[in-house]
Amino acid sequence: MLRRGLMLAALLLPLSGAAAAGEADEAAIRRGEYVFNAAGCYGCHTDVKAKGAPLAGGRRLKTPFGDFLGPNITPDPEHGIGGWSLADFTRALREGISPAGDPYYPAFPYTSFSRMKEEDIADLWAWLQTVEPADRANDPHELAFPYGWRWLTGVWRALYFTPGDFVAGDPPAIVAEEDREKWERGAYLVRVSGHCGECHTPRGVLGRWMRISSWLAIRLAPRVAPFPILRPIARLESVAGVWRTLKVIWKLAWTRTVISPVAPWAR
């Protein structure tokens, strides 16, 4: 009888292990969807105007250097990231290097993603595997001379790109000690996964952040609406400050990017 029980337990162990692994995968996928929405991947990798397939690429980003076309990041093995490994994906986000070893243009905000936690990258990768593959070839960027010379990106990286882990730093005095953890979480979302500063901070001639002007409005190209100022100019206790805060909360919670499909709340 004991022998039968042991045999039955041995047979059931793989099944229980598979169930536990399945639950872990589902949890990773749910977390990955959260990271996906926080990072705003949909906005740059979906051609909403042309009613393109989700994450199939083609979204045009106008800049002073020319137009960048978002690539296909569906699991399609030929045109998307279906042939990538998690290590390839991690290197792309944290180092800005493609699986072929080519540097990405910093229009892809790896300068912020480089500080993303590895567990967040793994979760995002797990969720992307659930996306419907799209057999859509990537469009070449349409850049002004001489920015089409990709080797120049290496010079830019040497000057302005410093990878590393995220360090929140000390919160301002207005943040209560009991809210420190929330502030650090918010700082991570804003500076890293949300990469808000990439669009809301002015840049110099070569695309370097003008950090003294962090969170001020920026216009990427002529005839393109500027991104709004994110600094808390008006105090919260004033009528203007309360109204401004309510507008930000409303946009983050309810809108679906009426102004621009680039913002992270596009979904």
What is each of the regions a protein language model found here?
Residues 83-88, 98-106, 203-208, 240-245, ...:
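Extended intrinsically disordered, low-complexity coil regions enriched in Ser, Thr, Gly, Ala
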Residues 87, 96, 101-127:
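Membrane-embedded segments
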Residues 136-158:
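Extended, well-folded interaction surfaces typified by the phenylalanyl-tRNA synthetase beta subunit core
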Residues 5-16:
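Bacterial N-terminal signal peptides
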Residues 32, 38-48, 89, 124, ...:
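The canonical Cys-X-X-Cys-His
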Residues 60-91, 111-121, 213-255, 267:
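Electron-transfer interface patches adjacent to heme c in soluble/periplasmic c-type cytochromes
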Residues 30-33, 46, 50-79, 107-111, ...:
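Sequence context of c-type cytochrome heme-c attachment sites
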Residues 18-37, 160-191:
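Electrostatic cytochrome c docking/interface patches
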